[in-house]
């Protein structure tokens, strides 16, 4: 390596380090509210099966997570939203809630879930929306961001990633 090449590499590394060392301006969530989702059980629950999206939308995969909760457990809204659906799908009781999250809707689904709400009803974060039916041994919790796009609902409980300056 020539001295000129070494100098160029050093200058590039120094410029990158200087850029990374600059503090980024903090950005609050719209309205200043907490954008994190709440666990549907009110607090973290043991996860039986984690989110494992398929390589293609038509393939099998886990489009949410299964939480280890007994029948009768109250289910709470993960965030403020509007109940999109509450009723049976393929003989399973389902609740789906549409949440606005920084301008983009996210639909949370809870299966099996005996509804204590109706479609079109506005709900607030932490409000009881249903219960895990008696005899059920888990709750499937999903999050959909589009017609065929899914995300891990457990990651939404963590909130946005925030970079902090080095001091």
Model-derived features with residue positions:
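Conserved beta-strand positions that form and line the central face of beta-propeller blades
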Residues: 66, 96, 109, 131, ...
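Zn2+-dependent peptidoglycan hydrolase active-site motif and core
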Residues: 78-114, 137-140
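Acidic, glycine-rich catalytic/binding loops that coordinate metals and/or anionic ligands
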Residues: 4, 29-43, 68, 115-124, ...
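Short, well-structured beta-strand-loop connectors
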Residues: 74-84, 116-132
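Short glycine/threonine/proline-enriched tight-turn/helix- or strand-capping micro-motif at secondary-structure
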Residues: 45-77
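Short acidic/polar mixed-charge low-complexity motifs
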Residues: 43, 73, 102-106, 147-150
């Amino acid at each position: 390596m020539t001295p000129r090449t070494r100098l160029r590499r050093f200058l590039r590394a120094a410029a990158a380090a200087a850029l990374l060392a600059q503090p980024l301006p903090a950005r609050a969530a719209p309205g200043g509210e907490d954008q994190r989702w709440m666990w549907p059980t009110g607090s973290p629950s043991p996860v039986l099966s984690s989110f494992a999206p398929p390589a293609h939308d038509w393939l099998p995969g886990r489009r949410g997570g299964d939480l280890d909760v007994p029948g009768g457990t109250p289910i709470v809204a993960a965030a403020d939203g509007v109940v999109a659906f509450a009723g049976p799908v393929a003989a399973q009781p389902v609740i789906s809630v549409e949440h606005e999250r920084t301008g983009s809707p996210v639909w949370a689904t809870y299966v099996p879930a005996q509804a204590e709400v109706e479609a079109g009803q506005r709900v607030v974060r932490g409000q009881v929306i249903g219960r895990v039916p008696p005899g059920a041994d888990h709750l499937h919790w999903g999050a959909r961001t589009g017609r065929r796009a899914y995300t891990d609902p457990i990651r939404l409980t963590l909130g946005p990633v925030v970079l902090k300056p080095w001091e």
